C-alpha cells in the first residue's frame, strides 16, 4: 500500500533528524502532493522499513504506474530527489546547525555532521557509492588508490534525446553555481532539491562549501566561488587554499590547473576540491631538499612522486603564499628545450600548476605540481598526458584527484576486466578477442608472458594489480620532469631559476 511507503519515508526523516515530530503531518501532506495523491490511509501497527533505496523505489514505481513520472533513469532520479527535497530542511536551518557545531564543538564536529546530513538527504546516494569498485596497488611511489566509478549515472540515451528537443536554459549556469541549491533539475541538469551549501569567506571573498555527490574518497568536498567565474591559478589561489585549511585543519584542499588537458572537467567555474583523506602523494617523502634564496625559513624540496611536485612547509602561511607566487611566476614563463618544456607556442601558454594545501604537524604545507599542456602530432592529446598505449585504461584528463594518486576509471572497465579475465584464464589467442576487448589485447599478452602462474583463482587480483601499475605509468607520462637523471637535472635547473 502506497500510504505505508509514504509513512516509511516520514519515519526515515524522523529517525535521521531531518524532520521533527511536529513536522510529521505537514511532511506527509507535502509528500502526498508530490505524489499527486489526495488521500492517506493510516497504516496499522508499527511501520518499519529496510532502507531508503527500497522506500524510494516503491514510491517512484507507483508514480510511474500512474503516469506521474516518466519511466527513465533520469526522470526517476529527478522525481525521487523531489521527494527527498520535502524532507530536507531549509538552507537557513542547515547553516545555523553547522555554525553552532563549528563554534561549540569545532570544525571536525561541524563537517562530521554536515557529511552525515548530506548522506541522509540522499544528496550523496550511499547505496550507489557502494557499487564503486575500489582497490589499492603497491608501487615504487607508494600505495595508489584505484576506483572504477559506478555511482555517477551513465548518460541515459532517452534523456539525451529528449534534452536535445527541450528548451535550452542557462539557469543555473553550471552544476557548481549557488543557484543549484533547491533547484528542481531537468533532463540535462540534475535535481538539487535536497542539496545544501555552507557559505565561507576565504581571502575576503564569498565562497561556498559542499560535498561531492559521487564521493571519490572520504568526505570529498567541493569549495566554490559564489560568482560564476573561470578557473585561474594565481597568487590569490594560494591564499584561498591556505585560508580554507585554517578553517578546516583536518581537511586538505587543492585546485585543478587552469588550462585545458591538464585541468579538470569544469574550467568555467572557479572551484577547489578537498576532503578528509591522505593520498599517496601526501605520504610521499622529499627526495631532494631545496633552499630558495630569501626563504630559508621555508622547508622545501622535490617530492618522490612521478608528477613533478615541489613541497613547501612553513608555520607562516603568508611566506608560503609569497614563495608559491614566485614559483608560479617563474614556471609560467619558463622554457627548457632540452626537457621539451615550452612556456608558450604561437602565443598559447602551456605552463601552469596544480596546487594542494594541508596542515602538517601544526604547520602550513603547499604541494605545487608543475603542469604543461603542450601537444604534438605524436601526442595530440598532450605530451604530458597519458600516452596512446595507456588509453585502453585511462584516456581522460589527469586532474587534481589523479595527480594526488587516485585513479578514477570509467565504468566500462568493470565488465571489460571481467570478460578479459575469462580470456586470460583460457589462454585465448588475443587476435580473436571481441571488438570491445581488442584495445586490451597487447596488454593482455604482456600479462600472460609475465604471469605464467595466472589461473582462475588469482586472475582478478593480477588484473587489478596490473591496472594499478598502468595508472603509475599514466602518472609518469603526465609528469613534466621524468624520474631519471636527465629529468631530475632539468627539475633542478628550474628550481635554480626561481628568483
Model-based region annotation:
Residues 236, 245-268, 274-335:
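Catalytic or ion-translocation cores adjacent to nucleophile or general acid/base/metal-coordination motifs
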Residues 194-198, 226-253:
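Helical scaffold of the NTase/Pol beta-like nucleotidyltransferase catalytic core
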Residues 1-223, 227-230, 306, 320-324, ...:
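Active-site microenvironments that recognize anionic phosphate/pyrophosphate groups
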Amino acid at each position: 500500500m502506497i500510504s505505508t511507503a509514504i509513512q516509511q519515508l516520514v519515519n526515515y526523516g524522523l529517525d535521521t533528524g531531518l524532520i521533527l515530530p511536529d513536522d510529521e503531518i505537514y511532511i506527509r501532506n507535502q509528500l502526498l502532493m508530490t505524489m499527486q495523491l489526495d488521500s492517506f490511509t493510516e497504516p496499522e501497527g508499527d511501520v518499519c522499513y529496510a532502507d531508503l533505496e527500497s522506500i524510494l523505489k516503491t514510491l517512484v514505481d507507483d508514480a510511474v504506474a500512474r503516469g506521474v513520472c516518466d519511466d527513465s533513469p533520469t526522470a526517476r532520479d529527478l522525481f525521487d530527489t523531489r521527494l527527498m527535497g520535502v524532507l530536507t530542511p531549509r538552507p537557513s536551518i542547515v547553516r545555523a546547525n553547522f555554525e553552532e557545531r563549528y563554534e561549540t564543538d569545532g570544525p571536525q564536529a561541524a563537517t562530521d555532521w554536515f557529511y552525515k546530513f548530506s548522506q541522509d538527504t540522499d544528496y550523496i546516494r550511499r547505496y550507489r557509492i557502494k557499487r564503486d569498485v575500489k582497490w589499492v596497488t603497491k608501487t615504487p611511489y607508494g600505495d595508489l588508490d584505484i576506483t572504477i566509478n559506478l555511482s555517477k549515472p551513465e548518460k541515459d540515451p532517452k534523456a539525451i534525446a529528449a534534452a536535445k528537443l527541450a528548451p535550452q536554459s542557462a539557469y543555473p549556469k553550471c552544476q557548481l553555481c549557488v543557484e543549484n541549491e533547491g533547484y528542481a533539475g531537468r533532463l540535462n541538469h540534475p535535481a538539487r532539491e535536497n542539496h545544501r551549501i555552507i557559505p565561507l569567506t576565504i581571502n575576503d571573498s564569498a565562497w561556498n562549501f559542499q560535498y561531492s555527490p559521487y564521493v571519490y574518497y572520504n568526505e570529498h568536498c567541493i569549495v566554490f566561488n559564489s560568482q560564476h567565474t573561470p578557473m585561474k591559478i594565481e597568487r590569490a589561489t594560494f591564499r584561498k587554499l591556505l585560508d580554507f585549511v585554517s578553517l578546516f585543519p583536518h581537511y586538505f584542499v587543492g585546485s585543478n590547473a587552469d588550462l585545458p588537458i591538464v585541468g579538470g572537467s569544469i574550467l568555467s567555474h572557479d572551484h577547489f576540491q578537498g576532503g578528509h583523506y591522505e593520498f599517496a602523494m601526501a605520504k610521499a617523502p622529499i627526495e631532494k631538499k631545496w633552499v630558495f634564496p630569501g626563504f630559508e625559513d621555508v622547508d622545501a624540496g622535490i617530492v618522490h612522486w612521478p608528477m613533478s611536485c615541489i613541497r613547501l612547509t612553513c608555520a607562516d602561511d603568508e611566506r608560503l603564499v609569497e614563495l608559491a607566487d614566485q614559483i608560479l611566476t617563474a614556471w609560467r614563463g619558463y622554457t627548457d628545450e632540452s626537457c621539451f618544456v615550452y612556456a608558450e607556442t604561437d602565443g598559447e601558454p602551456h605552463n601552469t600548476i596544480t596546487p594542494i594545501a594541508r596542515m602538517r604537524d601544526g604547520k602550513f604545507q603547499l604541494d605545487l605540481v608543475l603542469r604543461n599542456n603542450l601537444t604534438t602530432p605524436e601526442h595530440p592529446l598532450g605530451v604530458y598526458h597519458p600516452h596512446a598505449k595507456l588509453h585502453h585504461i585511462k584516456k581522460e584528463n589527469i586532474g587534481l584527484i589523479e595527480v594526488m594518486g587516485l585513479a578514477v576509471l570509467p565504468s566500462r572497465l568493470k565488465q571489460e576486466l571481467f570478460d578479459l579475465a575469462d580470456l586470460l584464464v583460457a589462454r585465448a589467442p588475443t587476435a580473436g578477442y571481441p571488438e570491445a576487448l581488442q584495445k586490451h589485447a597487447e596488454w593482455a599478452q604482456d600479462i600472460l608472458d609475465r604471469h605464467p602462474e595466472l589461473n582462475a583463482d588469482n586472475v582478478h587480483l593480477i588484473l587489478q594489480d596490473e591496472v594499478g601499475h598502468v595508472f603509475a605509468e599514466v602518472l609518469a607520462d603526465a609528469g613534466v620532469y621524468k624520474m631519471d637523471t636527465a629529468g631530475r637535472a632539468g627539475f633542478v635547473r628550474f628550481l635554480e631559476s626561481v628568483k
